[in-house]
C-alpha cells in the first residue's frame, strides 16, 4: 500500500512540498535521514513540524501552497497532543483554502480507528505495528517521507544497508561483532570507569542531526532504573548522549573534552571520501581537512601533551575515542550506520538486563499536562507550579 501510494505521488508530481507532522521517533529519525541523504532526494522540499510552538507551523503556511502540499500526520497512538494539535491547525488551513482533508493529508498510526474517527479515509491511513517503538520506527510507514524523498531504488538501498548490519549483528561471532564490541565499550566506560556521558561528533554536515537522534535512541531505550523483573539496577544504565557536528564542535566544547576533569568517551564519525554527487573543484581538499581534523582530535585525546612550564597547556591524554568510518554518504552506508547505533543500544540493554523497548518515563508529565488542560484542576500541583499557572 505504501509503495503504491509513493509511486502514485511520484508519477503525478502534484506536490511541491511534503510536510511530516510528528514528534519524538515520528520526527527525529526521518528528519535525520532527510538531512543525511538530501543529495539523493528527488522531491524538491520535505519539511518537518514537531513542536507545538505555533512559530514553525506558521512558517510552513507562509512557504507552502495548500494545493501543492502533502501533510503526513504521524502518531503511533494517534493521541499525541503536539501532533494532533498541529494537524488540526493544518486541517483548518486547508479547509479555509477549499482543499479537502483527504486530498492533502494522510495518517500514519497503529490505531486505524482513531484516524478514521478523525476524518481520514481508509485509503489515506498507513498502519504500523503496535509493537514497534517510535525510535525504532523509521523503517516502517513512519519513514514515508524518506521513501518519497529517496525514490524506490535508493530507498531499497537504504533498507539493504540496515539489513546488512542487522544480519552482521545476528550472525557474526562476538569477537568480530561490531555492535556488541561497541556496546561492551559503552558499558565498560559507563559502569567500570564511571563515565556518565558519551559524545558523538560526526565529521560530515549531512549527519548534523544524528547526535539528537542517537540521544533519543539510547536515553529513551536504556534510561531506566529497574531491570526487566522490576528490581533496582545495581549499576546505572544509559549514559547521557550528546554531540555536535565537527569541525564546528572543535570551536565549541572540545576544550572540555581535552582538559575538563570529566572524561567523555567520544565517537568520531567520518566518511573517507566526499559524496561523488556533489563533486566540485576543491571538494576533495576540503574533505581531506575534515579527515585530518578527525584523526588529529582522536590522536590528541589519546596521547595528550605535557607542558612543564605552563600547566594550563597540559593535556593529560588517555581519553577514549572511537573512529567509525565508511566510504561515502550513500543510502546504503547511512542505513548501515543507523542500524549500527540501534543494535548498540539493543545489545547494551540486553547486557544491563533492561527492557529497551518501553518508555514509561515520558508518560507522567503527559498525564499531568492532560489533567491540567482537560480538568482545569491544579489542586494536586506543587505551590510553585500553581503560582506559575496563575501568572498566565
Would you name each region that the model predicts?
Residues 1-9, 33-34, 39-70:
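Glycine-rich oxoanion-binding loops at beta->alpha junctions
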Residues 17-21, 70, 106, 199:
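Conserved beta-strand elements of the Class I
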Residues 29, 57, 73-76, 80-94, ...:
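Extended, hydrophobic alpha-helical segments in both membrane/secreted and soluble proteins
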Residues 93-278, 317, 364-370, 377-392:
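Active-site phosphate/pyrophosphate-binding segments
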